[in-house]
Curated annotation (Swiss-Prot):
InterPro entries listed in its UniProt record: Aldolase_TIM, DHO_dehydrogenase, Dihydroorotate_DH_1_2, Dihydroorotate_DH_2, Dihydroorotate_DH_cat, Dihydroorotate_DH_CS
Lineage: Bacteria, Pseudomonadati, Pseudomonadota, Gammaproteobacteria, Oceanospirillales
CDD domains: DHOD_2_like (cd04738)
Catalytic reactions of this protein: (S)-dihydroorotate + a quinone = orotate + a quinol
Protein name, UniProt field: Dihydroorotate dehydrogenase (quinone)
Positions that bind substrate: 65, 110-114, 171, 176, 245-246
E.C. code: 1.3.5.2
Cofactor(s) listed: FMN
Signal peptide: none
GO biological process, one term: 'de novo' UMP biosynthetic process
Localization (cell): Cell membrane
Entry annotated with the keyword Membrane: yes
Length: 346
């Protein structure tokens, strides 16, 4: 069924088909049809960051930027859904065209530029729904905000969403906002994260609820850089690391007509790089921080590979575009079987 729908959607401009799909999913929620979307399978829950996830497979940020369809997306079987990236003020993002499919590689290039309707709109969307699942909110900075002042944007977003999110992700690794990736390193990273951790702790002290803070990092780093980032995040007291965002590398798609398009490359070409980052993190952190693995998952085996490398949870996005809900089912079944075998010592 999805393959037929995909063949029709892929005849449209990528961004048009994206918006159409979200509109249809949002309509499913409005009409009370989500119960027909499949629902959560019976699986062993996974406890990470102090939260209980129904299963280990989540939807990565970027698909539902404005929390338009998170209820329906959750009803497809995801163990958790991450909305955003959201910024303090709404912004249009980069000029179009800015989204490109590479079907031969099951890949996508995007240079969207954090297009979203702003944090107040996103909060209003979340407040107007009763979502029973685990909901993450991915936060970023506005294009007009300097890198030096970025912490204020992240803090404004965190303080707005923390009453409504199950966890929050600071996106410091999108390649489509100039200078953003420089925040991953050294004192810049510490200065960005420290006020977010302090705000998380203030909220917990005031309301008795800890909302975990994760940080999403890029795949385009050396092993030493990955370790330095990890050390800083541990020192600052974050709750998790999401590895990874899209890559700037085009090595895997050389010769493709979109090879020279600017933006981040996601999908199968980033799989090995993201898995490598997960492995380096896991070996270095030694269970100090949980890792959520994302990048190039297009099968159940790919999802398990991330867990074997050291991730506790996984997220999918591009693979979902190419394979639809069947990938969710396959990844959930495979990761659940993996965890059950670990429990049995098989």
């Amino acid at each position: 069924m999805y393959q037929l729908a995909r063949s029709l959607l892929f005849k449209l401009d990528p961004e048009v088909s994206h918006e159409l799909s979200l509109d249809l999913l949002a309509a499913s929620s409005r009409l009370g049809l989500n119960r027909f979307l499949g629902g959560l399978p019976s699986t062993k829950p996974v406890d990470v960051m102090g939260l209980r996830f129904p299963n280990a497979v989540g939807l990565a940020a970027g698909l539902d930027k404005n929390a338009d369809a998170f209820e329906a997306l959750g009803a497809l079987g995801f163990g958790f859904v991450e909305v955003g990236t959201v910024t303090p003020k709404g912004q249009a993002g980069n000029p179009k065209p800015r989204l490109f499919r590479l079907p031969e590689h099951e890949a996508i290039i995007n240079r969207m530029g954090f297009n979203n309707k702003g944090v107040d709109h996103l909060v209003s969307r979340i407040k107007s729904h009763r979502y029973p699942g685990v909901l993450g909110v991915n936060i970023g900075k506005n294009l007009t905000t300097s890198v030096e002042d970025a912490a204020a944007d992240y803090l404004a977003c965190l303080e707005s969403v923390i009453p409504y999110a199950d966890y929050i992700t600071a996106n410091i690794s999108s390649p489509n906002t100039p200078g953003l990736r420089s925040l991953q390193f050294g004192e810049s990273l510490a200065q960005l994260i420290a006020p977010l951790v302090a705000a998380r702790d203030r909220y917990e002290a005031a309301y008795g609820k800890r909302v975990p803070l994760a940080v999403k990092i890029a795949p385009d780093m050396t092993d030493d850089e990955i370790k330095m980032v990890a050390d800083t995040l541990v020192d600052q007291g974050v709750d998790g690391i999401i590895a990874t965002n899209t890559t700037l590398s085009r090595e895997a798609v050389l010769g493709h007509q979109f090879e020279k398009e600017a933006g981040g490359l996601s999908g199968m070409p980033v799989r090995d790089a993201s898995t490598h980052v997960v492995k380096v993190l896991a070996e270095h952190l030694k269970d100090t921080l949980p890792i959520i693995g994302v990048g190039g998952i297009s099968s159940g085996a790919d999802a398990v590979e991330k867990l074997q490398a050291g991730a506790r949870l996984v997220q999918i996005y591009s693979g979902f575009i190419y394979h639809g809900p069947e990938l969710i089912k396959e990844a959930v079944a495979s990761t659940d079987a993996y965890y059950r075998e670990l429990d049995l010592g098989i």
